[in-house]
């Protein structure tokens, strides 16, 4: 099972898995913790499970046309899971920045200008923002409007 790689976060893993199973996904999450505590691994794990073809509720139908329960965890075998492992999943975006902080231009170019484009191959378009505490005030304000009125398919994960 994929979640065995993440240690000491069972309560968070269960929360994410239950949210996927029940179809109650929020449009934004904050994952907070010390440097080196595995925040990025947890965010990728969640994004991978969200995009996993096995968890896609549209495909969660058996041969008889009956809905089946989605597992809430990533299978690790489907095309989307393999793309996520190689960091090539087109609907999971990792926000990057070159300066000492995340400026308004990075937020506008990498999130705000991109978020209205529907997902390419998955049910969600997921943005992972590492070190989000390094956003300038202007970047925070630019992101705030997007978080307040996101498209239904968008999920933003802030790591601090």
Place the predicted regions along the sequence by residue:
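Residues immediately C-terminal
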Residues: 134-135, 149
